[in-house]
Amino acid sequence: MAKAKTVDARHYDVILAPVITEKSTLLSENNAVVFKVARDATKPAIKAAVEALFDVKVVGVNTLVTKGKTKRWKGKPYTRSDVKKAIVRLAEGQSIDVTTGV
């Protein structure tokens, strides 16, 4: 059994929130979990944060950036913030319950 990684306060700045959608629920059947992460987070930082916070073995990390939509408020256009998501693949037999808090 691998030694548990120590939790650093910076790990909480990397992982912002779980993404709970129909598509992410389907991915969870294949040992994958989707998180909203910081814009400047790298794949190794995301992997280290998930392994330390949830005590699981991460096999791989895929990231994507969703560009913010242009909206209107009182007739004036503005742009919503860009969002970075990480699809984290876990080792076989491991899972993360995203309905519980960290």
From Swiss-Prot:
A Gene Ontology biological process in which this protein takes part is: translation
What molecular function terms (GO) are annotated for this protein? rRNA binding; structural constituent of ribosome
Q: Which UniProt keywords apply?
A: Ribonucleoprotein, Ribosomal protein, RNA-binding, rRNA-binding
In terms of InterPro entries, this protein maps to: Nucleotide-bd_a/b_plait_sf, Ribosomal_uL23-like, Ribosomal_uL23/eL15/eS24_sf, Ribosomal_uL23_CS
Q: Which PROSITE patterns match?
A: RIBOSOMAL_L23
Q: Does the keyword Transferase apply?
A: no
Q: What is the superkingdom listed in this entry's lineage?
A: Bacteria
Could you tell me which NCBIfam families the record lists for this protein? PRK05738.1-3 (NF004359), PRK05738.1-5 (NF004360), PRK05738.2-4 (NF004363)
> Family, per the entry?
Belongs to the universal ribosomal protein uL23 family.
Q: What is this protein called?
A: Large ribosomal subunit protein uL23
Organism for this UniProt entry: Sphingopyxis alaskensis (strain DSM 13593 / LMG 18877 / RB2256)
